[in-house]
Amino acid sequence: MKVMQVIPKLGYGGAETGCYDLAHYLPENNCQSYIITSGGPLLKYIKKDKVKLFRLPVHSKNPLLIILNSIFISFIILFFNISIVHARSRAPAWSCLLATKFTRRKFVTTFHGTYNFNNSI
């Protein structure tokens, strides 16, 4: 199984730490791990021999960049044959939703905090 996580920045928060932990847990359990992020301080700790890393401006809420990101994410999904896409924030969730609709892959998203539960994502 190939799992790609998409997170705006790899800082030191809860979602970021969860992304880092899952990214390093997956290869130990016969899964391949991929991360798309725009950067962040945790990048230097990613074990690049275990996790494939891509840099895209997925932190942006600009509608044009969301569409462009979805195109790039679609190509990554198809080229690496990604099984599951996990978005860890609202901005990249829109790009991932479009990409997974186009590529017909599984899509999951998580959030923590107070958001409107009537949202389609």
Descriptions of predicted regions:
Residues M1-I121:
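Membrane-interface segments of envelope glycosyltransferases acting on lipid-linked substrates or membrane lipids
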